[in-house]
């Protein structure tokens, strides 16, 4: 019994150690699970942060693209505006015939380039000899020109109304045919202003009777089918 009495405490102590060992291993396993879960959470957080950065990068890219589109649209609008303003300027040409030798008229339908050859005096007026060239790829016929002429245009705004009242104008009809790329001589007769005083000329195209084709008869060169 004595021996058995000693054995029982030893057995109890061993059992206690066994239970403590089980608790230790259970706690260690729990810690490992928690560490593993923590790693998984960190991985998920890192993935979310990466996705967030990717989304932010996409948003920044979209914002840059949008800004680029806006800037490009503004530039295109500005360019179109400048072209339209220049186009309106080319609807007619204003020049000092004593100083200008070359000019362009382009109203969107017809494009002409011109060069002034000479200005000669006539009774109560002037005659301008010039060449015109058709910038289109097809012949243009029956051109008419609206012309305004006079003395030098004043630089002061207060003098413009009186100057405009003294300007002369007329419409010059013609049956000339302007072939593509070919210079054609034209004579303008401007009454009322001598060559020494002729410092302003405005030329515009009248489209009323314009023909976009050759007015010269074309021989039929098609061969008749043999019977």
From Swiss-Prot:
Membrane association type: Lipid-anchor
Signal peptide stretch: 1-21
Lineage: superkingdom: Bacteria
Residues lipid-modified (S-diacylglycerol cysteine): 22
GO annotation, cellular component aspect: plasma membrane
Chain coiled-coil ranges: 31-68
Lipidation feature positions (N-palmitoyl cysteine): 22
Subcellular location field: Cell inner membrane
Keywords attached to this entry: Cell inner membrane, Cell membrane, Coiled coil, Lipoprotein, Membrane, Palmitate, Signal
Assembly and interaction partners: Homotrimer.
Domain remarks: The homotrimer is held together by an extended N-terminal coiled coil, which leads into three separate globular C-terminal domains of beta-sandwich topology.
Function per UniProt: Required for proper surface expression of the autotransporter adhesin SadA. Could be directly involved in the biogenesis of functionally active SadA.
Protein name: Inner membrane lipoprotein SadB
Species in which this protein is naturally found: Salmonella typhimurium (strain LT2 / SGSC1412 / ATCC 700720)
């Amino acid at each position: 019994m004595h021996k058995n009495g000693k054995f029982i405490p030893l057995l109890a102590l061993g059992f206690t150690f066994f239970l403590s060992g089980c608790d230790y291993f259970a706690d260690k396993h729990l810690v490992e699970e928690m560490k593993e879960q923590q790693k998984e959470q960190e991985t998920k957080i890192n993935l979310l942060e990466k996705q967030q950065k990717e989304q932010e990068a996409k948003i920044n890219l979209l914002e840059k693209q949008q800004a680029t589109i806006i800037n490009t649209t503004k530039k295109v609008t500005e360019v179109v505006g400048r072209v339209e303003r220049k186009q309106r300027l080319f609807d007619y040409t204003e020049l000092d015939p004593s100083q200008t030798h070359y000019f362009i008229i382009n109203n969107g339908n017809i494009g002409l380039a011109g060069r002034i050859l000479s200005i000669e005096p006539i009774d109560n007026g002037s005659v301008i000899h010039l060449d015109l060239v058709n910038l289109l790829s097809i012949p243009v016929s029956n051109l008419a020109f609206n012309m305004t002429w006079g003395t030098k245009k004043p630089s002061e705004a207060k003098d413009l109304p009186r100057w405009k009242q003294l300007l002369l104008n007329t419409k010059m009809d013609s049956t000339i045919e302007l072939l593509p790329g070919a210079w054609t001589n034209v004579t303008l007769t401007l009454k009322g202003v001598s060559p020494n005083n002729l410092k302003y000329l405005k030329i515009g195209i009248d489209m009323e009777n314009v023909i976009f084709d050759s007015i010269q008869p074309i021989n039929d060169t098609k061969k008749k089918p043999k019977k």
